[in-house]
């Protein structure tokens, strides 16, 4: 979870951790939740959204999907920057 109430940063945890976090983020007056993800965690985010939509929150829809690429600094021992895919998935509660 993040400091922003309607943003979830997806990382290395299993998809079910995010499946439980998505309904919690809709508490109060939040009608939109955004999942921000990059790199190999994109598959985890997609799995979490699909599990949530089909099993627990039938009234959840995907509002917007934004894809892009970020330039990351080189790792130790590497001499050039690397490009990493990014994705933002906005979920809307109807």
Task: Locate predicted features.
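C-terminal edge-of-domain segments
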Residues: 63-94
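Histone-fold modules and their flanking histone-like tails across chromatin and transcription assemblies
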Residues: 1-26
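Charged, well-structured alpha/beta interaction segments
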Residues: 28-49, 53-54
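Beta-strand cores of modular interaction/reader domains in eukaryotic scaffold and signaling proteins
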Residues: 9, 34-36, 88-90
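Structured beta-strand/turn binding interfaces of compact recognition modules in eukaryotic regulators
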Residues: 13, 38, 92-94
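Core residues of folded domains in eukaryotic genome-function proteins
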Residues: 6, 29-31, 85-87
């Amino acid at each position: 979870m993040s400091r922003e109430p309607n943003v979830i940063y997806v990382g290395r945890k299993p998809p079910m951790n995010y499946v439980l976090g998505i309904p919690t983020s809709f508490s109060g007056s939040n009608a939109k939740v955004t999942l921000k993800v990059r790199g190999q965690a994109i598959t985890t985010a997609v799995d979490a959204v699909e599990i949530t939509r089909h099993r627990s929150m039938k009234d959840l829809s995907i509002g917007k999907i934004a894809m892009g690429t970020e330039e990351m600094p080189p790792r130790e021992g590497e001499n050039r920057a690397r490009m990493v895919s990014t994705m933002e998935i906005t979920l809307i509660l109807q």
